[in-house]
Amino acid sequence: MSDDDDKIYIYSDLFSKNFSDDEKDDSYEREKQVYSGSETQNAENEYSKLRAQNSTILNNYFDNDNIKNVENLKSNDPDQIDLILFPVNKNYYMNLFDGQLIENIHSIKLRKAGFYAIYVENNNNSKWDGIYFGLSRMQVELDYKLITKKNKDGGEYEKRNTSSYDNTESVQNTVGSEKEETENKNEETSNYNSNLNNEINKICKYNLDQTDILLDDSNSERRRNSKFKIKNTNYYDNLMLQNKYTNSILYDDDDDKNNTETYTCTFKTEDQIRVPSQKKKYIYLYNKYDNATLDLNVHTYMSLGMSILCKYSLLYCGKYNHIPRDPYTPFKKPVSILSLDGGGILTISTLLVLNRLEAELRKEIGSDDIKLIDCFDMVCGTSAGGLISLALLREIDLQDVSNMWPSTIKKVFEGNRNIISGIFFEGYDVNNVKDVFLERMGNKFMSSYKKFYCFVTATDVKHKPYKLFLIRNYTHKYNSINAESYDGINKVPLWLAAWATASAPTYLKGPSAEDIKKLGINIKPEIHLVDGALKASNPALIALEECARLNNKNLSTFIKEDLDTLVSIGTGQVPTKLTQSGASSKSASTFEILINSTHLLTRANDTHREVLQRLADRENTYFRFNVPHIGDIEIDSQDVRDFDLISKATQDYLFDEKFYEIKRLAHKLANNYIRSKYL
């Protein structure tokens, strides 16, 4: 045994070792040398404290080489931090880092306004988590801060890096002079933009005045002009809001001020997240302005100086669209609606009906490029029907949806679950199911899709009595007339909407207020969402009421004046009776949901009868497809024989009972499509 092996190191000896070459060049180490001669108190001085913080000895203990990834460390000097541009050339995904992490600092210029997601994955071997005897875990910690032009102009901008610089005074003077110069430029730009906006408003006002003069020849024209003026002046005032931070004149980005929604959705501009070993997390943020800056500081937490294998990325999740763009004319033509019932695996029947209808439509028009979804102004769904609606909103082809559907539904309802196991093991495999929704639906937000109006139903069990909650891609300017105004939100990613609408109690725990907050999304009042089938297994009537509300008309007037076609597809499913009666201070459990849901379930056929009565005077308007003899099949069945039974029963139904109705509907949709495109 060598002398070195015989030597016993004590705490003070460890910190009296000579510095390595790297440490001599390190400003942090030089600062520690200043304190190395300070008086010792309780066997510990300032020098030992600082050196313990850096944990370089443990690095040398576990590995002969310094395991810090020096290439990925950014300088403390803000001028030396590389500015990353994102997105670039329609590349909406960027892998920022994948490897052994100690500490990385990034400054990213977000070139587009819209929603973003930060993804962090900790691939550390969990065996190291026992180093603290189970009291804590080695984690990846990420601090982020979104800095917009508004923050900079207001003088609120500060760099996240809090490390000391060698020449603090000179740096402060430099920053101060640069700040004064920047403020002067910003003031000039702001004045220029304000003057420009005033000039544009004067021009627009002059044009409106000239329109009044030209249309002043007759009383009838004057009346028409008066109506036009009242309508468009309000619309113009809302649209042409001055934005002191951009050169464009658009809607105010704070859309909550321009609608009647009671629920608000906000995002943090700075926060901190920690990811344990073998876990991954998403955090979402909303950038209102082009060319904002996102600062990231990613480092290990409670790792004793060891590096952690991880990766993290940045995703662009779509632009926020104001839907409808013109709230006074939400529909440019008579409205066609597609409504899809819930029903688990029974929605195989729904897809067969949709595919058959699309085939007939293409035959009528004579083109294989036409999509069925192009013929509808609103698409909605509940539970599994909601998943299909979201897939169509994402513009996935019907055939592709059909191909992936059995495996998707199987994963959502995976396992032999019953009411007992559902109550006591709620949330079983919820992370795996969330991964399925992420893979199938993606991270883009509902409001980033504007091809047609879309909503999926959910049930809010945070408040009693439980109530219907809609996840939409649009907002309402008006309240309903002589009807209920349904609550809802539109600033959520598609996968979260899918999780909410398909969270059938005893199968899948729905997203609670805490789950949503962990994603960086703050919804007020708080919500806890589960399967929409508890309130509306058939959303056809809800769709009619939503369209009437968008048009600012009562339901009867909308049906008489604006409705063209309503297509409702059922699943033959009679909902199983579960077992309702303020706000709950905690998330409702599966047991509470079951106990309080005896009278919540609405049968799909009851809704069908009510819609039929309301549309009795409208010929060739309402089309309902609901395959018989499949309602007794369990919605979570994994039996291939049940799949075959559903397929055969649906094919027989379409080619026997509904053969001519399919052709009649396809002919009507084809004529509507041709008129809207070419006439």
Swiss-Prot record:
The record ties this protein, via SUPFAM superfamilies, to:
FabD/lysophospholipase-like
Which reaction is recorded as catalysed by this protein?
Answer: a 1,2-diacyl-sn-glycero-3-phosphocholine + H2O = a 1-acyl-sn-glycero-3-phosphocholine + a fatty acid + H(+); 1,2-dihexadecanoyl-sn-glycero-3-phosphocholine + H2O = 1-hexadecanoyl-sn-glycero-3-phosphocholine + hexadecanoate + H(+)
The places in or outside the cell where this protein is found are:
Cytoplasm
Q: Where is the composition biased (Polar residues)?
A: 35-45, 162-176
Q: Does the keyword section mention Cytoplasm? A: yes
| Signal peptide bounds | none
Return the EC number. Answer: 3.1.1.4
* UniProt-annotated catalytic positions: 383 (nucleophile), 531 (proton acceptor)
Q: Where is this motif: GXSXG?
A: 381-385
- Keyword vocabulary terms for this entry: Cytoplasm, Hydrolase, Lipid degradation, Lipid metabolism
User: Which residue ranges have biased composition labelled Basic and acidic residues?
Assistant: 177-188
Record InterPro entries = Acyl_Trfase/lysoPLipase (IPR016035), PNPLA_dom (IPR002641)
GO molecular function per UniProt: phospholipase A2 activity
Q: Where is this region: Disordered?
A: 19-45, 155-194
Annotated motif DGA/G: location in the chain?
531-533
Entry annotated with the keyword Acetylation: no
EC top class named in words: hydrolase
Q: Which residues form the PNPLA domain?
A: 338-544
Q: Which family does it belong to?
A: Belongs to the patatin family.
UniProt protein name: Patatin-like phospholipase 1
Q: What is the lineage of its organism?
A: Eukaryota, Sar, Alveolata, Apicomplexa, Aconoidasida
